[in-house]
Regions:
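Alpha-helical structural elements of signaling/regulatory helical domains
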Residues: 49, 67, 85-88
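N-terminal secretory signal peptides and thylakoid transit peptides that target proteins
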Residues: 1-22
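C-terminal segment of N-terminal export signals and the immediately downstream linker at the start
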Residues: 5, 23-64
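Short acidic alpha-helical/loop segments enriched in Asp/Glu that coordinate divalent cations
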Residues: 67-75
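Mature-region segments of soluble proteins
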Residues: 56, 74-178
Length: 178
């Protein structure tokens, strides 16, 4: 048998093996877990229930379906860091989660979306809610994370590149060209 070139039989064998290999690899992708949903959060001051409630609370205040909980967990880790050094702050968070759970005498995490929203609405003016809301958008919050910037197409602060005057402010790609 000649090894020069590729005949019809060799082509069919090679392409069918490649197709079978692609099918196996493609089906394995459905089995592998989504890395955006695999996350771990370490807290030292806040207990697990309080921390998980705060993650879901941050998501409820600033919902983005395409963002995984890992981005919201970073906010809770920052809340925990502040709670380590400020006992009054830790008390506000723990009592706030307890008050949120007490609205319907059921853990807030177990409520349906409508009841969760109603419970949050009833607590909007409390220091607890305002603290969590402020931390969620503050200097260590959701929109300060470079990976979140990438998700929304934000290139980051312009001052690092000389500001908008020397860099140009019309270099965005999402506006239609006229």
């Amino acid at each position: 048998m000649s090894t020069k070139g590729m005949n019809r039989r060799r082509f069919l064998q090679t392409s069918s093996l490649a197709l079978a290999g692609a099918a196996v690899v493609g089906s394995m992708g459905a089995i592998l877990p989504d890395p955006t949903n695999a996350w771990a959060m370490s807290t030292t001051t806040l207990d697990a229930h309080t921390a998980l409630t705060l993650v879901k609370l941050c998501r409820a205040i600033y919902p983005h379906d395409a963002l995984g909980d890992t981005y919201y967990a970073k906010i809770v880790e920052e809340l925990d860091k502040k709670a380590q050094t400020d006992p009054d702050f830790a008390r506000v968070l723990q009592e706030g989660v307890a008050a949120l759970d007490a609205v319907y005498h059921v853990q807030w995490l177990d409520l349906s979306e409508g009841y969760k929203r109603h419970a949050l609405k009833s607590m909007e003016s409390t220091p607890f809610f305002q603290t969590v809301r402020g931390f969620s958008i503050g200097s260590t919050g959701l929109y300060s994370q470079p990976l979140v910037w990438r998700h929304f197409g934000y290139e980051g602060p312009s001052w690092r590149f000389g500001g908008y005057l020397t860099r140009g402010f019309d270099d965005i790609g999402w506006l239609p060209e006229d």
